[in-house]
Amino acid sequence: MKTFLVPLLTLLCVHTFAAEKTPLPTAHTTRNIEGWNVRVDDRLLSGDGAGAGERALKLLTARLVAITIVVPEQSLAKLRAISIELDLNYGDLRNMQYHPDAGWLKENGYSEQLAKCVHIPEVEDFLSPFENHRMPWVVLHELSHGYHDQVLGFDEPRITAAWKKFCDSGKYQSVLTSPGPMREHYGLTNPKEFFAEMTEAYFGSNDFYPFVTGELKQAEPETFALMAEIWGSLPARDKPKAAAKP
């Protein structure tokens, strides 16, 4: 009896796991939000998910508005060519991500239509108060992966060279993060994450030091100059208006 019990239990576990696996969305509605094509999971537009969908669309709109305000027009036009997909949930995927490879998607049972798109696979994670406080510019982070891939090329030598200097400096093995703990800088991972992290600090705020543009300019002046070269200059301070004559 024991020789048959283990396989039987294994089959039952596999069957239960398969039955509980989160389903993939079956239909989307495309909306234009601030110039981006956003494919919205229909489960977020009606039924039980409509409330979360409404909040997520408001949040995504706010994030995209912020990007349109600070990114120079020439670069912004190229960012807007990158589609975004917003889902209630999507299989085992949780974190927002950019999908560069249709082959990987196919191998893992996901839609190849996600290739070259920024994907928000779980609305609950997107609406997380902690994650929004920690990474308010994460949408730009993921869009910058698309820009790196589709506009510059992932083999862009200027970014690779800057990343190597960043790694070799030894300064980023343990840095302050926005929640407080010291951690290894995520930009050390590879040139792709380095570019996305530095882009967040250049235009907005990152969750690893250097957090904002002034700190980036002070700590990594060459990287700051590279961001300006690739993206364009930061917005200039508005000149004060002359007082009207009485």
Predicted features by range, described:
Residues T26, I33, L79-A81:
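Extracytoplasmic
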Residues T16-E20:
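Boundary at the C-terminal end of the N-terminal hydrophobic targeting segment
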Residues L24, A102-D125, P129, W163-P246:
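Metalloprotease/metallohydrolase-associated module, dominated by Zn2+-dependent proteases
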Residues W36, V139, E193-E197:
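Short N-proximal segments of mature Sec-exported proteins
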Residues T30-E54:
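Acidic/histidine-rich, surface-exposed loop or edge segments in extracytoplasmic proteins
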Residues F4-V14:
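Sec-dependent N-terminal signal peptides
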Residues E54-D168, F224:
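Acidic/His-rich structured neighborhood in mature extracellular/periplasmic domains
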